[in-house]
Regions:
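Glycine-rich portal/gate segments that line the openings of hydrophobic small-molecule binding cavities
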Residues: 8-15, 45-57, 65-71, 78-152, ...
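Exposed, flexible binding/inhibitory loops of compact, secreted disulfide-stabilized domains
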Residues: 29-35, 210-224
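Generic N-terminal initiation segments characterized by hydrophobic and/or small/turn-forming residues
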Residues: 1, 44, 90, 217-220
Length: 229
């Protein structure tokens, strides 16, 4: 009987592990993180930025409850961008890619009046693909970037706000090369950074309501529990 070489056995075992990972990711991990913290109603909700979403993209909807007034949350939200207050996520990780990111821990008055057409940069000296322009602005309620990254505030009461983030990927559907990069690499990385950003906004907005204001914690430590409605 023909026996498989040790190399063939290792290759077969590696392929089985890869297949198991892809199945686990596709059936369990991806469905969880694509709707992290969001309710069924929020996922089905029509939002003002939806017309900006290209049909070839993959869309996620994530949400988090913030125990602060929507006006307080908005003040942090409009500071997004490397050219302003950062993204409140893992700047040390972003800076590995020369983003020169610095996350603000205070409200800066000069950044509180964004306009449609203003640029939101993702890194220092950004190439065109790392610059997003504000496509739609509803002060206090909605901030939508061209290409389909949208942020919405839904007040639950005077002191509680839902932050809903809907994100459309770069074109993926119909392109195997784009899909091979997007699903195993970009999508999980973007989730970690976006969830960290949402937790960073939550911590800063809630800290502003406390006396004395605590320093924001590492968002990753709260990743699983803080997004619950």
């Amino acid at each position: 009987m023909l026996q498989l070489s040790s190399t063939a056995k290792r290759l077969g075992a590696s392929l089985l592990l890869l297949l198991a990972f892809l199945v686990a990711y596709g059936f369990f991990v991806q469905p969880w993180h694509m709707r992290w913290g969001a309710t069924d109603a929020e996922i089905a909700m029509a939002l003002p930025g939806d017309p900006f979403i290209p049909p070839t993209t993959v869309v996620s909807t994530r949400a988090i409850t913030i125990h602060a007034p929507s006006t307080q949350v908005w003040a942090w939200l409009v500071q997004l961008g490397q050219n302003h207050g950062g993204f409140y996520s893992y700047d040390w990780l972003e800076n590995l890619f020369l983003a020169q990111m610095h996350n603000a821990d205070r409200i800066v008055p000069e950044w509180q009046n964004p306009q449609v057409g203003d640029e939101v940069t993702m890194m220092a000296n950004p190439p065109p693909m790392s610059i997003a322009k504000i496509a739609l602005l509803d002060p206090g309620r909605a901030l939508v970037l061209k290409g389909g990254w949208a942020f919405y505030l839904q007040p639950l009461d005077a002191q509680t706000t839902r932050l809903i983030v809907r994100y459309a990927s770069f074109p993926v559907k119909g392109s195997w090369t784009a899909a091979l990069f997007y699903y195993p690499i970009f999508e999980p990385a973007h989730f970690i950074m976006e969830a960290g950003m949402m937790l960073g906004i939550k911590q800063r907005a809630e800290a502003a309501m406390s006396t004395p204001a605590p320093k924001p914690n590492d968002p990753l430590l709260l990743l699983a529990k803080e997004a619950r409605p």
